[in-house]
Amino acid sequence: MIFKSEQYYTFLGFLAIIIWGTSAVFTRNLSVNIGAYTAAALVNLIGALVVIIRQLIKKEGLSNWRDVPRRYWIFCGLLFVIYTVTAYVSMSVVKTDEIVVVMVLIRFLWPLFTLVSTIPILKAKASPWLICSVFVCMAGIIIARLETGAFHLSYFFGRNLSGSDIVGYILSFIVAISWGIYTNLTRKYAANKNVDGVGVFMLATAVILGGVAFFVDEPRRFSINMTSQILYASIIVGAVANLFWNLSVKKGNMLLVVLIANFLPVISTVSTSLMLGVKITLPVIIGSLLVAIGTIWSKACFNTKEKSANAIKS
């Protein structure tokens, strides 16, 4: 019975990974058809209600909100808003779905940036090989954008570092960096405390972006399809996947789940390509594998105790 229970919770972890792998497609669709600010506000409003209601029912996560310093609410809240804005706006500025696939890969650099930012924030120690692992990940991003048969850096920089594409790339890097810093500040200020401010952060984000949406001209093409995608992004991705992940880490085979999670860049780029109808090219596969390998390598650059703690987060 124990074995079956562990299998069940491990399976929930796999489901969470699959759900996260599909999230970028819905962010893209909502940003283009509803508008980045309007969509982000609605998704976070619904998600916040789900999270906060659950916390109130279970009487956990908010009852001890005074136990964490004010800096947690200010800095982590600000980073959460930045992460959300850049995640949606980045998907709305690019013109082609092929660019979206590469941007998804960039966004999944967040485990790498989480590990790197532990050095200044949590005073973690890493070996010099960490620099090499970062270069491997960045090489993966560059290769993923090269077309088959066009493995030339001059071609890459000439074609991609201009216009709306470069804006999308920069915003995607901000998505990854902001989430990495957010993760470590949460750990610094709220570790071992029964406080979870995600619901509050989502609600604050919804209010701020909802206010911005009033002054921005956006398409707002609502339909049954778009409404269902809003519900999926807010409830399934925002609440259910996180719940599944937490349960799998606590009660499932954590090592197996975290191992599979390391390949989220591959899973997400493949699923995004399939859902958007974009051809899966060899450079994209090689690039996503390099990002996954670089991330795994970066974890090996920390000592065992730090590596185990960060593995749960990333």
Where are these regions (language model features)?
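Specific alpha-helical transmembrane segments that line the substrate/conduction pathway
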Residues: 38-41, 45-49, 88-123, 254-273
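Membrane-interface capping segments at transmembrane-helix boundaries
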Residues: 57-61, 299-311
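Specific transmembrane alpha-helical segments of multi-pass solute transporters/efflux pumps
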Residues: 23, 59-100, 143, 234-252
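Glycine-/small-residue-enriched transmembrane alpha-helix faces in small-molecule transporters
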Residues: 1-41, 47, 82, 86, ...
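Hydrophobic transmembrane alpha-helices of multi-pass small-molecule transport proteins
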Residues: 51, 126-149, 262, 271, ...
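Hydrophobic alpha-helical transmembrane segments of multi-pass integral membrane proteins
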Residues: 7-12, 37-54, 70-75, 132-139, ...
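Hydrophobic/small/kink-forming positions within alpha-helical transmembrane segments
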Residues: 18-21, 25, 52, 77-81, ...
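Membrane-interface helix termini and inter-helical loops of multi-pass transporters
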Residues: 25-33, 62-63, 91-96, 145-164, ...
